[in-house]
């Protein structure tokens, strides 16, 4: 297999494969926060992220969610369908936390009657600004129909994920998804799902996600290992 580096991101390197419709994602031992302002190498993080994301994507595939995930091929590597990434971060919030609490001046941990879906424009130079549907259309990122699908699919994924995490005693506070167009022009779930891009709290309100790194609350890999071990009990 000939692997040429196509893209180096904060958490993963993306390589070509012998199949032009398939890419290899290699998870890094790097933790970043605040758009890369805080950065640290943490041994074992790449393995844990690959394990967790592969597990979740396998379950999503089995539940009928169309994703880019093909399979885990090593401790740090997985094969994915090549997609044209939509430059949006789709965030769903089940509880108030993080930037939402700061933006609206509310305390963290308030359950939202209806989960809220938000869009953020993927642009590092602009610090990934919060945008609405009209901005998405103005920037020609997605049509009305595509926007509606992104929201509907994110809500469907939320129901699945919330149920799975509830089974193992964790609250899914919020999460970020990315989507892309496959070779047939179909929108499918891409990127990853791990404690890097979601918030998980246990019954005592302890953070079981990257906030441990953001806020200096403990050892990141210890927390991710607990999440990985708990995931084995999901039915």
Curated annotation (Swiss-Prot):
Family to which the UniProt record says this protein belongs: Belongs to the SAICAR synthetase family.
EC number(s) given by UniProt: 6.3.2.6
Pathway(s) served: Purine metabolism; IMP biosynthesis via de novo pathway; 5-amino-1-(5-phospho-D-ribosyl)imidazole-4-carboxamide from 5-amino-1-(5-phospho-D-ribosyl)imidazole-4-carboxylate: step 1/2
One Pfam family here: SAICAR_synt
Record keywords, A-Z: ATP-binding, Ligase, Nucleotide-binding, Purine biosynthesis
Catalyzed reactions per annotation: 5-amino-1-(5-phospho-D-ribosyl)imidazole-4-carboxylate + L-aspartate + ATP = (2S)-2-[5-amino-1-(5-phospho-beta-D-ribosyl)imidazole-4-carboxamido]succinate + ADP + phosphate + 2 H(+)
Protein name, per record: Phosphoribosylaminoimidazole-succinocarboxamide synthase
GO biological process per UniProt: 'de novo' IMP biosynthetic process; cobalamin biosynthetic process
Listed InterPro entries: SAICAR_synt/ADE2_N, SAICAR_synt_PurC, SAICAR_synth, SAICAR_synthetase, SAICAR_synthetase_CS
GO molecular function, one term: ATP binding
Enzyme class name: ligase
